[in-house]
From Swiss-Prot:
The lineage of its organism: Bacteria, Pseudomonadati, Pseudomonadota, Gammaproteobacteria, Vibrionales. The keyword Transcription does not apply. The gene is fadB. SUPFAM superfamilies: 6-phosphogluconate dehydrogenase C-terminal domain-like (SSF48179), ClpP/crotonase (SSF52096), NAD(P)-binding Rossmann-fold domains (SSF51735). In the N-terminal section; belongs to the enoyl-CoA hydratase/isomerase family. In the C-terminal section; belongs to the 3-hydroxyacyl-CoA dehydrogenase family. It comes from Vibrio vulnificus (strain CMCP6). Residues 1-189 are annotated as: Enoyl-CoA hydratase/isomerase. The keyword Nucleotidyltransferase does not apply. Pathway: Lipid metabolism; fatty acid beta-oxidation. CDD domains: crotonase-like (cd06558). This is Fatty acid oxidation complex subunit alpha.
Length: 723
């Protein structure tokens, strides 16, 4: 043994050939701070080892290295710039040390080799993979960019254009593509991977492969003419500006980094990379996006605990109510390996549900995600039925009939008679209280809400609603089932609108009040989309949701929270509803809609809206962007905080993920609680109090006032990281 540490070891495997084996005691290898320090010492030991002829990098896991340890990021990024810069210099000196070994090096690349793992193997001379290899640099998805030499080495290995595509998109390449672009030097069968890599290294030692020329290319300036460079970088900047937009600076910064470093040799190019990395690491966007990643891991952890705690795993399910929603739920369950009965009283609805499932599976087939055999198997595991036959075998039943409390209660009561005492019943409802529906059941402890978002196959969030009598076992089983379906389940306590709809309607309330006071809805949409970062402005969102749906939900919320959400008079939603302008579904709402060539609705402004809104809106007047943002966001933020204060949602992490996954809250802002930390709670309180005359929706919750006085934050502990 040449060197041994907790997460890696170095030994001589044959005459003069040493192997650096990454072997962390956990389920995956990560380039955490401790592993980097060990790698540094291992390379020193190798440099001092006599008779060294070549070095192999291997892993004892199915994945080579999944990346850096993201749990350490926020702690690192919180350090002063100078300290972060020094740490990056140290980290890069390790990869330079690997690249500068006086002997050829080869990496045995299997499974996920991402982020820091990819940057590590880029420092070797040769890279051999197998069919499991997935290699790339996903850092821009976290608001940062490669900082261990990825922006320097990747363009020199595969060319600037391919490198910018991978880095700006945060892309991972499968083995075939990686081989084609030169990121891998060979792809072999898994059982021959180690032997092939050893043979490749032997060929390099015997100078059958010119490893020195390869290394020279990586440590020199990029070989691009002025014209090539201008065309390449100008085109990349144009594409990135179009796709990433102004709220996500990391992809553009990566292009600029590669461009600035192109004319320099490795060490100077690394200095440029480091300077830009530090700037991104200190940004609010990086803090928010890394925070979302950590929150997502937190939610996955809760789901894993629930699955372990549940006494029974869901093997079979049933959906009551077919159509688009029921078909979507059945498809998602079957796709993830849980066979499902789809029951309805109307054959036409069953046909619609099966058509929806077939349509979604055909899309998977077209994209090459599944083959025809797999598609047939998934479709066969959805059983459409007009009767309850076989439903007694279901472990979980999802009721997804029409949004009417009497109909839902009758269906739930009826199905309860058909199933065993262990069967869990759930209701897919967006507005009806779970405690109300539970009254129709003999076993309310086996019942909870399971609120899917539309379209089911695309929306990651499922709200799991705990009723007054719901047992922990029921919650654990439903959370585990939602996670098995590939969803992000978040448990909330029962109240009108649950969490997501409860916090959405004060936002719509702020919108209605702005219109009442003479604001232009097209300006509000532009500001909330372009400046704040929502995927849709409120008027457009209402049209997509459906004015009739929003009108009904608004009445439910007003009844549930009369002080804040009760209406003083008619508003814009009432005016459109009464004029039968329901939005996209009937071609006319705030905007008018026509179908484009692809069959997608395209919006346009029409003057016919003006007389409809006139009775509920003051004469048009100008509002600046900041006022619009404040008046729109304060009611939502207040309601989110009240939900935490009242225990409707358990944590800031879960609330922020629900907002991003369920409402499309701008990810670069990280959710309401991350946003409050970013702007400063005391600053928010002072700003919100300037609008207090607008009514109860603008009253700041006591929790925020107390936290502002104490100088507290919501993410203080997470911000410290694990260092």
């Amino acid at each position: 043994m040449i060197y041994q540490a907790e997460t890696l070891q170095v030994k001589e495997v044959q005459d003069g050939v040493a192997e650096i084996l990454f072997c962390a005691p956990n389920s995956v290898n990560k380039l955490d701070l401790a592993t980097l320090a060990s790698l540094d010492k291992a390379l020193d030991a190798l440099t001092a080892h006599s008779g060294l002829k070549g070095v192999m990098l291997t892993s004892d896991k199915e994945a080579f290295i999944v990346g850096a340890d993201i749990t350490e990021f926020l702690g690192l990024f919180a350090k002063p710039e100078e300290e972060l810069d020094q740490w990056l210099q140290f980290a890069n000196s390790i990869f330079n040390k690997l690249e500068d070994l006086p002997v050829p090096t080869v990496a045995v690349v299997k499974g996920h080799t991402l982020g820091g793992g990819c940057e590590c193997v880029l420092a070797t001379d040769l890279r051999i993979g197998d069919k499991t290899t997935s290699i790339g640099l996903p850092e821009t998805k976290l608001g940062i960019m490669p900082g261990f030499g990825g922006c320097v080495r990747l363009p020199r290995v595969i060319g600037a254009d391919s490198a910018m595509e991978i880095i700006t998109q945060g892309k991972a390449c499968r083995a075939e593509e990686a081989l084609k672009i030169g990121l891998l030097d060979a792809v072999v069968d898994s059982d021959r991977l180690y032997a092939s890599a050893l043979q490749t290294l032997t060929d390099a030692i015997n100078e059958k492969i010119d490893w020195k020329a390869r290394r020279q290319q990586k440590t020199s300036a990029l070989t691009l003419s002025k014209l090539e460079a201008m065309m390449s970088f100008t085109m990349a900047k144009g594409l990135v500006a179009q796709v990433a937009g102004p709220h996500y600076p990391a992809p553009m910064t990566a292009v600029v980094t590669i461009e600035e470093g192109a004319r320099f040799a490795r060490n100077q190019a690394l200095d440029i990379e480091r300077k830009h990395f530090v700037k991104l690491a200190k940004s609010e966007e990086a803090k928010a996006l890394v925070g979302l990643f950590l929150n997502d891991q937190y939610i996955k952890g809760i789901a894993k605990k629930a699955a372990k705690s549940a006494n029974k795993e869901t093997q079979r399910a049933a959906v009551l109510g077919a159509g688009i929603m029921g078909g979507g739920i059945a498809y998602q369950s079957a796709l993830k390996g849980v066979p499902v009965i789809m029951k309805d009283i109307a054959q036409a609805s069953l046909d619609l549900g099966m058509t929806e499932a077939s349509k979604l599976l055909n899309k998977q087939l077209e994209r090459g995600k599944i083959d025809g055999f797999k598609m047939a198997g998934i479709l066969a595991s959805i059983t459409p039925s007009l009767h309850y036959a076989g439903i007694d075998n279901a472990d979980i039943i999802v009721e997804a009939v029409v949004e009417n409390p009497k109909v839902k209660a009758a269906v739930l009561s009826e199905v309860e008679e058909q199933v065993s005492e262990e069967t869990v019943l759930t209701s897919n409802t967006s507005t009806i209280p779970i405690n109300l529906l539970a009254k129709s059941l003999k076993r309310p402890e086996n019942f909870c809400g399971m609120h899917f978002f539309n379209p089911v196959h695309r929306m990651p969030l499922v709200e799991i609603i705990r009723g007054e009598h719901t047992s922990d076992e029921t919650i654990n089983r439903v959370v585990a089932y939602a996670a098995k379906m590939g969803k992000s389940p978040i448990v909330v306590n029962d109240c009108p609108g649950f969490f997501v709809n409860r916090v959405l309607f004060p936002y719509f309330g702020g919108f209605s009040m702005l219109l009442r006071d003479g604001a232009d809805f097209t300006q509000i949409d532009k500001v909330m989309e372009r400046k704040f970062g929502w995927p849709m402005g409120p008027a457009y969102l209402l049209d997509v949701v459906g004015i009739d749906t929003a009108h009904h939900a608004q009445a439910v919320m007003a009844q549930g929270f009369p002080e804040r959400m009760g209406k003083q008079g008619r508003d814009a939603i009432d005016a459109l509803f009464e004029a039968n302008k329901y939005g996209q579904k009937n071609g006319s709402g705030f905007y008018t809609y026509t179908m484009d060539k692809k069959g997608k609705p395209k919006k346009a402004f029409s003057d016919e809206i003006v007389p409809i809104l006139a009775p509920v809106c003051a004469a048009q007047q100008a509002f600046d962007d900041q006022t619009i943002i404040q008046r729109m966001m304060i009611p939502m933020i207040n309601e989110v905080v009240l939900c935490l204060q009242e225990g409707i949602i358990a944590s800031a992490q879960e609330a922020d993920m629900a907002l991003v996954y369920g409402l499309g809250f701008p990810p670069f802002r990280g959710g309401v609680f991350r946003y409050l930390d970013s702007v400063g709670i005391a600053n928010f309180v002072a700003m919100a109090q300037q609008h207090v005359e607008l009514g109860a929706m603008y009253q700041v919750p006591q929790m925020l006032i107390d936290m502002a006085e104490k100088g507290q934050t919501f993410y203080g502990a997470q911000q410290q990281g694990s260092i």
